[in-house]
Structures are given as C-alpha cells and as structure tokens.
Amino acid sequence: MKKMMTVAALLALAPLGWAGSSADTTDRLEDAAKVMHEIMAAPDKGIPEEVLDHAKCIAVVPHMVKGGFVVGAEHGRGVASCRTEHGWSAPAFFAITGGSWGLQIGVEGVDLVMVIQNEKGMQQLLSSKFQIGGDASAAAGPVGRHASANTDWKMDAEILTYSRAKGAFAGLDLSGSAIRQDDDSMKAVYGPDVNQKAVLNGEVKAPPEAAPFLSAIRGAKEQAAGQ
C-alpha cells in the first residue's frame, strides 16, 4: 500500500517537475497548437466562430493530468494569449492546480481550452493568481459551427471551457482550481523581469517558438467558418 501511494504521489507531481526549461516551453507551445487545431477540426464539435469573435483571451492546457488513488487533483501547465490592438499577444505561461474530480484510480490526461470572454475574466488572467469559481466563473462552452441563438453563454461566465479526453469531448468542472503564473517558464522564455500582465498586454515581443501556437489561435476562426 505504501508503494502504491508513493507511485501515486510521483505521478501527481510529475507535470510540475519539468517546468522551466526552454525545451519544455517549446514542447508546450507546440502541443497547445496541436490541441487547438484538433479541437477546431472536429466536425460539429469545435469552438463556434461567434465565441472566437467574442474572445478576449484564449488559454490552452495540453494534457492536464488528473490522478491519485484517493482524491483526484488537477495538475497542468498551459499557455495563454490575449487580444490586443496589434493582434494576439505573446504567450504567457501558467499552471493550474487544485480542485477535485472525485474518487479516481490511476491517471488520465485531458486537453483543455479556456476562452476568456469578457473584461473581468481577462483582468483575472492578467493577475498573478486567481481561483475559478471564486474570482472568475467558468462554464462549458457551446460547440458546433454556430453558437446557439440563446446568448446566455455571453453572460453566464467569464470563462468558457472545452475539454477532450482520449479524443472524445467531455465536460469538466474546474470549480476550486487555481490558475497562477508559471514563474520558472516565464523566466526561461522572457527573463527574470517580465510578468504575465506585461506579456498578455502586448508589451513583449513573441519568441520565435511561439509561432505555431499563435498561428493556431489566429487560424481558429477560419477553421470555425469552414466547418
């Protein structure tokens, strides 16, 4: 039993252990671009064009892990970009932790896209840390070529979520999860004196390795229109 708990603890901590290297941030950007492309390419399951038009920021967590032998906890590291007057900003790096998905056996990876759709949600993302469900509300976003004629999705939550497990779309309750700046990764890419707010406000030039992710963000609307 002790050995099983040790394995569980190592698995839960694994995603946090390799943050901060340039190789990790490059891989994360490439994986995030792939997640965006694949979610948008899913017939009648992609993010609607209207939602993308309305988006203030888009955040992607490739392969968020839930695991543990008692209570499942979320662990993931992602990238985010916000809309500025000059286009989409350079990517900021963040971590998502906490919350619970109930009793779990083993570990499962989930791809997550969060569309921040109003000024309040954007301001929370610009801060160094906030809690979903407390500082900002989240709800499952509409899917398909066009958003529902019902406009509740524009008003009900600051964040619309889209999640995928093993290629299938799945609902995900992020209540209680905390999103914070990934300091190690930010320093690895931008140096020690650049924070998340400066990056997402468009004050920092995007590094070359961000090109695939930013291209996926810019191209998402075209993919939605072509569904």
Positions of predicted regions on the chain:
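Sec-dependent N-terminal signal peptides
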Residues: 4-14
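Small-residue-enriched, tightly packed secondary-structure blocks
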Residues: 20-227
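Sec/Tat signal peptide C-region and signal peptidase I cleavage site
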Residues: 15-19
